[in-house]
Swiss-Prot record:
The gene is rplP. Part of the 50S ribosomal subunit. NCBIfam families: rplP_bact. This is Large ribosomal subunit protein uL16. Belongs to the universal ribosomal protein uL16 family.
Length: 137
């Protein structure tokens, strides 16, 4: 699972997710990609579930690039704890994904296989997605 090796601050602010992604909107490594059409936090477990769904469908053929990384920690208080008395303990890691960001890329397989593999991966994610192809240079 994807987690940072070390971080400067264990607890982060939630932040705002306004507008579109600044970079990473085009397919750059592979031939086909999965682009987010809405913004959301994606956990490291969701990224791993999507990766497994893709690689299983492709039967270990082709290559997959994961272009998002869960660098932001989120916190949660224990169940049954009253409000106040500080921020909760770090619970997990998320990747804030804005709309327009290409999250996964695939190469080395046919378009039909890539389309279906990315469709299966999109069902594991909390964002609406669309299939994109690499633009001819």
């Amino acid at each position: 699972m994807l987690v940072p090796k070390r971080v400067k601050h264990r607890r982060e602010f939630r932040g705002k997710m306004r507008g579109e992604a600044k970079g990473g909107k085009e397919v750059s490594f592979g031939e086909y990609g999965l682009q987010a059409t809405t913004s959301h936090w994606i956990t490291n477990r969701q990224i791993e579930a999507a990766r497994i769904a893709m690689t299983r469908y492709m039967k270990r053929g082709g290559k997959v690039w994961i272009k998002i990384f869960p660098h932001k920690s989120y916190t949660a208080k224990a169940i049954g704890v009253r409000m106040g008395s500080g921020k909760g303990a770090p619970e997990g890691w998320v990747a804030p994904v804005k709309r327009g960001k290409v999250m996964f890329e695939i190469a080395g397989v046919s378009e039909e296989i890539a389309r279906e593999a990315l469709r299966l991966a999109s069902h594991k994610l909390p964002v609406k997605c669309k299939f994109v192809k690499r633009e001819a240079e």
